[in-house]
Amino acid sequence: MAPHSTRRRFALWTLLLLSGCTRGLLTTVGPDYVQPETAAAKTWQSEQPGVSEAHAAMPSDLRDWWLQFKDPDFFRFLTEAQRVSSSVADARARIETARVEMVTAMANGLPKLDTQVDMLKSRSTFGGPPFDWTRYQAGLQANWEIDLFGGISRQREAAEGNLASRHSAWHDARVSLAVEVANAYIDFRYCQALMQIAEKDVISRRESARLVDLAGVAGLRPPADVALAKASYADAEENLMRQQGLCDRSIKGLVALTGMTEIEVRYRLNQKPERQAQLPTPPPFRLKGLPAETLLQRPDVAAAEEQVAEASARIGVEEAKRYPRLSLTGNITPQLQTVSGMSAFSPYAAGAGAAATYFANTWSFGPTLTMPIFDAGKRLAEVEAARIQFEAAKTRFQSTVRTAVKEVEVALVRLKTAEERLPKTREALKGYEKNFTATDHLYRAGFGNLLELEQARRQTLVARRTVADLEQEQVLAWVALYRAAGGGWQDPEGGAPAIPVREDPHNPVTGQKAEDYKP
């Protein structure tokens, strides 16, 4: 019966110790994490996009949004930028660092086993012939810190929060970079559109200057009209040159973002004439779900929320240092010793030069209890510092949420304004173009005034630029809404390594929330 009773007690102790791998064996000090409430309103205050083909989407549904642009060159710029970006690489490195910390935290709650092998050889004399002594030793040392009060489990929770936060920051870096590349690409196509407007304006003014010059030579137009026509033509050429310089600057920006050569960037931008001066068409979507649900999927908001979870767990880590610590240690060390040339000392030696061999086996096992007695308030101060850090993390989270709400609402306003203004500006452009055509015909027939013609030309030029501006603003507003809603990035080569899902355990002993916790 005794052996069976011993085995039952051993199994019971093993189950109890293993149960402490996720919670403290006796209790888990410190607050249990509770997700902070967001100050977001119940509904979006700004009107959602009114596009009929827009589909309702959560941020997780937007991971292939860039692919729906159906612009291979644009998508190539995105993937190249992701590949060479230092900000994305730094974020990925921080993930790996957090993963190492996670492995360390997981290992702290498990037994540790080390081995040691050594050999020692010596020669001694005691006023007589020398004898040699050799020892061979191999040992196993084991140590297991028992998580009595949950300090180790809190370390694991903190590591999980840190890893999840780093992963969200990596995602945020990728989305931010994708938006930056998209804006640069859109700016270049917009610049090309303005270039086309400027080129048409140059052609129109050059023809007007030529006709006015011929009329002036024939004495049909005064010198003032000839000078004004030439000045107008020169002004159009200067505007075209300025616009060309702006487009070249946009290309430099794409080169810096993608790491591609300028020759390759220019080739991809100009290889298909049908895409030149054509803004990409973003797939429309409508935000689905409550603002709080949407915002919590933004990577920056998720990162801030995970930092709150980490800070909450750090309180328990520091609090556990104020309680006793229990460790189980043990070792097994077999030894083999040989002694030669010791006939005078060993009753087993047959004669001079004979050798004797001894075998010994030693072991030890026992608990070690470490109890803090006096530290001049150091541990209590560290708990208070951890609690302050938690409050700061919670404040940063609320600030991030407010910023996210603002960005979504502003993007919705931008989009709605652009959608409402575009039809009006296009209608105005048609009217100005008709007015310019009529004025030009009158002037060519000799019934108009050059000043009226130039005024009609300027009005048409301004209207064309206004339409181009609003078309760009509409595309940029869609990109801004995608970014503000926390849209994802579909990586064709795979994403970051998967991360463990942080648990939200309940402490039946303390039953405390982080905001209520006092050391």
Task: Name these PLM-found stretches.
Residues 152, 161, 168-290, 414, ...:
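Periplasmic alpha-helical coiled-coil/stalk elements that build and connect Gram-negative outer-membrane
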Residues 22-180, 326-330, 335, 360-366, ...:
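Short flexible linkers and secondary-structure junctions
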Residues 328, 369, 386, 393, ...:
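Hydrophobic, well-ordered secondary-structure elements that form the walls
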Residues 89-90, 106-107, 146-174, 224, ...:
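Sec/SRP-type N-terminal targeting helices
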